[in-house]
Amino acid sequence: MSTGNESYNLRYPKGFKGYPYNMYKLEGYGTPKGYITLIGVVATLTVSGLFFAKTRSNKREYPTHNKEWRAKTLAYAKETNADPIYQLPKDKI
């Protein structure tokens, strides 16, 4: 019985049983490897997204942002907003 391929006949003599009959099963043909990879990628991205969302929601304030700093910032904001150059005319609203 000839396979039609001379290099195959030279490499694997008649009766050679080193490889299974169905090479596709050996290589994983028919198994959902693509789906498993996709599930792994989605799971990794989901876990990392949840982790970073949690770390962003649990951010500590800066050590310099104390009560005095907040009060001065609010006073500056009120002073800036009171400046008429920042006020839109009523007809533009």
Swiss-Prot record:
Q: Which GO terms describe its cellular component?
A: mitochondrial inner membrane
Q: Which UniProt keywords apply?
A: Membrane, Mitochondrion, Mitochondrion inner membrane, Oxidoreductase, Transmembrane, Transmembrane helix
Q: What superkingdom heads the lineage?
A: Eukaryota
Q: Name one GO molecular function term.
A: oxidoreductase activity
Q: In which pathway does it act?
A: Energy metabolism; oxidative phosphorylation
Q: Which residues lie on this side of the membrane: Mitochondrial intermembrane?
A: 54-93
Which ranges sit in the Mitochondrial matrix compartment? 2-33
One GO BP on record is: oxidative phosphorylation
Task: Report the protein name in the record.
Answer: Cytochrome c oxidase polypeptide 6, mitochondrial
Native source species: Dictyostelium discoideum (Social amoeba)
Q: What is the lineage of its organism?
A: Eukaryota, Amoebozoa, Evosea, Eumycetozoa, Dictyostelia
